[in-house]
């Protein structure tokens, strides 16, 4: 698919009040990205393990409260964190993406892998999604939610993680969101953010490169300072980065 077609489609979907449903239909019936494949589930599992490793390295607590920014359509990472043994997971997204059938697909993979018991409940057609997630999986679904003002208590969270979300956030909002993260995170807590700087349209159009700026500017672009936009506001909020600012 030409990336311009996807850009146009996403723009058109956003013009309608039911654009979210159209987008969901398109991902199920046109692009085939939903429901998530086993490969996609395994990618999410690997990503969750990477965040878990950061938590263990910089301050692990068995009963820590976890907060995810950008939980998406199927809650794969939140469910995986449940399987790690975390009893209380806050899953926030600005859009009410979550669909019961997509959550069930992840639960199915997890049962196949023996990460959760076979008798762990799925979400029925008329099931209360939020109640089942809370009661059975310890997931507090915060959708639609506002990461700038979560309503959570100060210093109530042990761990925060986010996977390929912050690159979609307007730069002027990042300091506000990070300030809220700092407020809710315990002073010895850990925040783990994975930022993907590659062009997300590369997945559907191989005629573009993962880093199109390099293709456009060629030898004239010696270095892109990728982490400055995040590290500077994070440090200003009070965070202590455990990696140096870098570039490519």
Whereabouts are the PLM-identified features?
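Class I SAM-dependent methyltransferase Rossmann-like catalytic core
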Residues: 24-62
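Conserved class I S-adenosyl-L-methionine
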Residues: 62-73, 190-215
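S-adenosyl-L-methionine
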Residues: 107-146
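A short acidic, Gly/Pro-enriched loop at the edge of an enzyme's catalytic core
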Residues: 147-160
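A short glycine-rich, Lys/Arg-flanked "PGG" loop and its adjoining helix->strand segment in the class I
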Residues: 175-187
